Design a protein with these regions (language model features):
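Extracellular polysaccharide-degrading/modifying enzymes targeting complex plant/algal/animal polysaccharides
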Residues: 1-224
């Protein structure tokens, strides 16, 4: 995660969406769609055929019109796939041609309401507030699109650097009280009578897709046995 003035910025993606106007949650207008609702036999698990449409803002969302190279060797796009009603997975694009792409199959695949978007390639970096990390050539290079007229050297950048501020194993009667956790959280394992009380957790967990880690559950707040 990347933050400016404590606000989360958007990982470079297609179709574009933002946090500050709520469009990032609007899958009917700011995600791409598969044709499965028109024909449940149009394709099978592991394939999506894009269904072009014009969203509520008047923007055409059409994969074939973008000219992307989604399956470039070692630089494949990451597809975020909502293919199981309330379940979403991330997968590398394994093959792409025109309006069709392939990915490693997912569990609980359903023949209705397929939504998706892409991350993981620099060509998606085209909107103010988006960012991308170059994991191909120089892992120290971070790209950010600042607002028009804004000098990025004067912005207050902060980045998530760890999953857990406290990772506690086999402990008893340990208490964490009245702390604020920003872009980090806590993990307890095999403990007894441990307590987290009066704490604020702001952006505690996130995927590691920017580091090209896919098909992995985010490291979340946990009390594990």
């Amino acid at each position: 995660q990347l933050f400016i003035n404590w606000e989360e910025q958007v990982m470079a993606r297609w179709p574009n969406a933002k946090f500050n106007d709520g469009t990032i949650w609007d899958n009917d207008n700011y995600w791409a769609k598969g044709t499965i609702d028109d024909d449940e036999n149009a394709y099978s698990n592991g394939t999506i055929i894009d269904d072009p449409y014009t969203n509520s803002a008047g923007t055409l969302i059409s994969l074939s019109s973008e000219g992307f190279d989604l399956d470039e060797t070692n630089k494949q796009a990451i597809a975020i796939l909502n293919l199981g009603s309330f379940r979403t997975w991330s997968r590398l694009v394994t093959n792409h041609s025109g309006n069709t792409f392939n990915y490693a199959t997912v569990p609980s695949w359903k023949t209705k309401h397929h939504y998706y978007y892409f991350e993981g390639r620099k060509e998606f970096l085209d909107q103010e507030g988006e960012w991308w990390v170059d994991t191909y050539n120089n892992k120290d290079s971070l790209y950010y699109v600042a607002a028009s007229g804004v000098d990025p050297n004067k912005l207050d950048f902060r980045g998530k650097v760890q999953s857990y501020a406290f990772s506690v194993n086999a402990s008893e009667y340990l208490q964490i009280k009245n702390l604020e956790f920003f872009a980090t959280t806590v993990y307890f394992s095999n403990g007894d009578n441990c307590l987290v009380y009066g704490c604020n957790f702001i952006y505690p967990s996130c995927s590691k897709r920017m580091l090209r880690i896919v098909d992995t559950e985010p490291e979340m707040t946990k009390f594990a046995s």
